[in-house]
Amino acid sequence: MRDGGVTIQILVVTLLHPLPRNGSRGVFVEDHIHLLRSMGHDVRVVNPLPRMPRFAEARRSTMMGVAKAPKRWMKDGAEVLSPRFFALPDHPYPRLTKWSIGRQAKTIERQLDSWRPEVILCHTLWPVAELAQNLAARWKIPWVGIVHGYDFDVALEQKSLSKHVAELSRRCDALVCASSRLSSIASKLEPSPKKLLTIPCMTEIGKEWRREVKPLSKSWKKEAIDILFPTDPRRPEKRHLLALQTGEEMEQRGWIVGITTLRHQPRNIVFDRMLVADVTLVTSKREAGPLVARESLLCGTPVVSVDVGEVKDYLPEEWVTKATPTALADGIEHALYHGWKDEISVEEKLAFSNREQVTEAWSALLSDLVS
């Protein structure tokens, strides 16, 4: 909200967003939209989707529900626009994809009727930032690119996409990265972004799920433990096999182990699973957060993780290990035996991503852009 309490009209253009058949898709973007609306802003959402046959959804869990998603639908009392664009797997023809998505600007302008934003926020640069850029140019307003991981960890490393991602990073009026690691990558781009900030995804769970992280209350190696693998095992970058190998290592040490995975569950079910789990195991190759690690800690479940994202900033050093079954098993045993022993509480460690801090950061940026 502007100084003086004036509502800002914001258009969110995002590659990921919940769909009618996939409510867990892009929940971190949905959290941001809810935050902006709670700040009093008028927010509209455009979620461009690639054209694809139903069978192609099996390639990635994030594609579930995309093929038959409606082009216009209601979410939380507000309309979501989902124009289609052409894209092939791994984007061998990026210029064709840019042209396909960029030409949707006129359609979006017509669908919004007389409503016009004062700023555009674009979650994930490739390829939807091309649409954000075209709309911003038509309306002569600023736009903000928001990087969560894919753009720099995957697209920037692909020969066919790297120059396009770098160009989009430069063209936006401000580039927001979800972690300091991503901001460090952005700062080394040539030319560098006009304005670079680090604003994490907000971490917030209801009081009914909040617990303290305590040592294991079960009998040591006599009762079964539940290890939570907090994502869809079909996503290769999450390394489900490493989690299974870690479970086998624990069993060789005398533990009775069960591993629970999460597939497209709504948020309240995810938090319930975190409450009943004895430990959360993160084995991802790439993460901006990961958000699930912070949420798990707030639910009272210890988190053992490979060194990914920002976990070193708040997890005990014994809980951040090498990406081997033995090291991860050592971390799990330490977490189960000791619980949270840091003098600084979990809430204080995660204060950088709480509602107040994230609200303040976005309020300052938006006020600066539209003033």
Short names for language-model regions:
Residues K214-P215, E237, Y337-V370:
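A charged, aromatic-enriched C-terminal amphipathic alpha-helix characteristic of glycosyltransferases
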Residues M1-K68:
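N-terminal subdomain of nucleotide-sugar transferases
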Residues N47, A166-R211:
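Donor nucleotide-sugar binding/catalytic pocket of nucleotide-sugar-dependent glycosyltransferases
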Residues A293, P302-S305:
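Short hydrophobic beta-strand element within catalytic cores of glycosyltransferases
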Residues A155-K159, S187, M202-S219, E223:
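Acidic anion/phosphate-binding donor-loop and adjacent secondary structure
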Residues K285:
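Aromatic "clamp/platform" in nucleotide-sugar-dependent glycosyltransferases that forms part
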Residues L11, T203, K218-K238, L244-G247:
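Conserved donor-binding/catalytic core segment of Leloir-type glycosyltransferases
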